[in-house]
Amino acid sequence: MQLNADNEHVVIMTPKGGIHSGIPFVPVDMPSVYYDVVTQEIIIDGNGYSAYYDVDIISESTLLTVLSTNVDGDYDTIDVSSLPDDNYTIVITSSNNNEYTGQFTNY
């Protein structure tokens, strides 16, 4: 589990860059996504990009989508406190059709 400086936000995904045609790049619309341990919310920060995101949260025990929503990407929170304790995969698709995935545990 990777925590940020305040030890309450678990890092689900942050832009790390990659290699494309031999040139390092960071996807322009990749959000920073955190899980707030205290409030049990997913925090999605679009880092100033003007993308919109479709968010699907999939239970790893049932492989069913348990939550599906859209966010504008500026700075949004999604309440997952009502979801059962489980491991989840979060799939975020930007309005530019880029897809990002990460995992978190709700407890």
Residue ranges and their predicted role:
Residues 98-107:
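Edge beta-strands of extracellular beta-sandwich domains
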Residues 46, 67-70, 102:
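Short hydrophobic alpha-helix segments
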Residues 59-64, 88:
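Short, glycine-anchored, charge-dense loop/turn motifs used at functional sites
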Residues 39-48:
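Aromatic/hydrophobic beta-strand junction motif of beta-rich domains
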Residues 72-94:
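Short, surface-exposed loop/turn motifs with a glycine/proline- and acidic-biased composition
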Residues 47-52, 83-85:
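Short proline/glycine-enriched turn/loop motifs at strand-loop junctions of beta-rich domains
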Residues 54-58:
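Beta-strand signatures of extracellular beta-sandwich domains
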Residues 2-37:
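Transition segment at domain starts
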